[in-house]
């Protein structure tokens, strides 16, 4: 590989400390579900302040800075109103998704990283496995992560069908109503149908960008 083949993205030059009391990932869902439109957090974009029905589309692996540096590839997303907020630490998928849906920091909900020391083993929190065995019976997801997602409400979740019933799904999405998709093109159709049926809040999750970033980095494939 030549130096000219390397794509350098602009990133924050120093670590950012999460501000859990202000404009942070943990405040999104409580702000959407607990407040009336006129009572939502002031850092919410105005369209979200006024919205009576909300679809929260989580694009894993697409941060604000990545979106800015790839703006030409996402003109519709760039046309939407918004700004950067802080995430949690560590900002790995398992911890961040759990913080998003519970409104709690990793220290509070217990999913503190991609791998966790469980005393008798080191557990991959997305797979709920050690190097040798399934840990679902040894460490039940609902006892590892005890905070109810979506402030205790039963919310429709539009995500990959194969994620339904997994231990990590039980840990961070239990009590929700799964609406699985097999092709990403189904996400919009399913969300539209749910809103048309009267749902006030829909949670949708797409992991394709994150997978590409892990496998190929932030270059031409991203």
Segments from the language model and where they lie:
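Short, solvent-exposed loop/turn and secondary-structure capping segments
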Residues: 66-70
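Short acidic, Gly/Ser-rich segments with clustered Asp/Glu that frequently serve as metal-coordination loops
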Residues: 61-65
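Short hydrophobic beta-strand that contains or immediately precedes a catalytic carboxylate
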Residues: 56-59
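Catalytic cores of glycan-processing enzymes that make or break glycosidic bonds
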Residues: 50-53, 103
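His/Asp/Glu-rich, glycine-adjacent segments
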Residues: 2-37, 71-82, 88-200, 205-216
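An N-terminal domain-cap segment
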Residues: 36-50
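Acidic, glycine-rich loop-and-beta core segments that form the ion-binding/anion-interacting portion
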Residues: 217-222
């Amino acid at each position: 590989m030549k130096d000219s083949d390397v794509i350098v993205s602009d990133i924050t030059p120093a670590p950012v400390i999460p501000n859990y009391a202000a404009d942070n990932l943990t405040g999104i869902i409580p702000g959407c579900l607990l407040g009336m439109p006129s009572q939502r957090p002031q850092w919410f974009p105005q369209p979200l302040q006024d919205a009576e029905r909300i679809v929260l589309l989580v694009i894993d692996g697409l941060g604000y800075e990545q979106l800015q540096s790839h703006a030409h590839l996402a003109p519709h997303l760039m046309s939407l109103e918004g700004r950067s907020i802080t995430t949690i630490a560590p900002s790995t998928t398992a911890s961040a998704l759990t913080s998003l849906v519970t409104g709690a920091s990793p220290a509070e909900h217990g999913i503190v990283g991609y791998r966790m020391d469980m005393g008798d083993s080191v557990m991959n929190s997305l797979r709920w496995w050690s190097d040798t065995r399934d840990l679902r019976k040894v460490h039940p997801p609902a006892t590892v992560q005890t905070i109810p997602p979506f402030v205790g409400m039963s919310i429709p979740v539009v995500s990959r069908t194969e994620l339904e019933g997994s231990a990590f799904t039980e840990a961070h999405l239990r009590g929700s109503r799964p609406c699985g998709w097999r092709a990403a093109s189904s996400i919009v159709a399913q969300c539209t149908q749910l809103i048309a049926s009267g749902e006030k809040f829909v949670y949708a999750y797409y992991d394709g960008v994150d997978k590409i970033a892990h496998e190929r980095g932030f270059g031409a494939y991203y």
